[in-house]
Amino acid sequence: MMQPKKTKFRKAHKGRIHGVASSGATLSFGQFGLKAMAPERITARQIEAARRALTRHMKRAGRVWIRIFPDVPVSKKPAEVRMGSGKGSPELWVARVKPGRVIFEIDGVNLQIAREALTLAAAKLPIKTRFVARIAE
């Protein structure tokens, strides 16, 4: 699973996801992509599950680019522990995704397989997404 090798701080504030994506909103590498339509925190496990669904359906043909990275730690207190006595330990890693952000890009497969594969990947994510394709040049 994806997580940073080294971070400046162990724990992070919850924060809010405001606005729309300005960077990472267009296809940069592949011919087809999956674009987020709502703000959401996507965990490293969800990204990995979507990536596996994507590569399995493509039968390892073509190329996959993951355009988001889970760099925000989410802390959690153990079960049945009273409130107080500090913030919990880092439990998982999430990526803050804004609407309009391209999550996955693929290339080297035809339109039908790309659409099916990205639909399967979208089912693994907790977010509304849209299939995008590069205009034929």
Curated annotation (Swiss-Prot):
InterPro entries: Ribosomal_uL16 (IPR047873), Ribosomal_uL16_bact-type (IPR000114), Ribosomal_uL16_CS (IPR020798), Ribosomal_uL16_dom (IPR016180), Ribosomal_uL16_sf (IPR036920). GO terms for cellular component: cytosolic large ribosomal subunit. GO terms for biological process: translation. GO terms for molecular function: rRNA binding; structural constituent of ribosome; tRNA binding. The keyword Metal-binding does not apply. Keywords: Ribonucleoprotein, Ribosomal protein, RNA-binding, rRNA-binding, tRNA-binding. SUPFAM superfamilies: Ribosomal protein L16p/L10e (SSF54686). NCBIfam families: rplP_bact. Part of the 50S ribosomal subunit. Belongs to the universal ribosomal protein uL16 family. Binds 23S rRNA and is also seen to make contacts with the A and possibly P site tRNAs. PANTHER family: 50S/60S RIBOSOMAL PROTEIN L16 (PTHR12220), LARGE RIBOSOMAL SUBUNIT PROTEIN UL16M (PTHR12220:SF13). This is Large ribosomal subunit protein uL16. The gene is rplP.
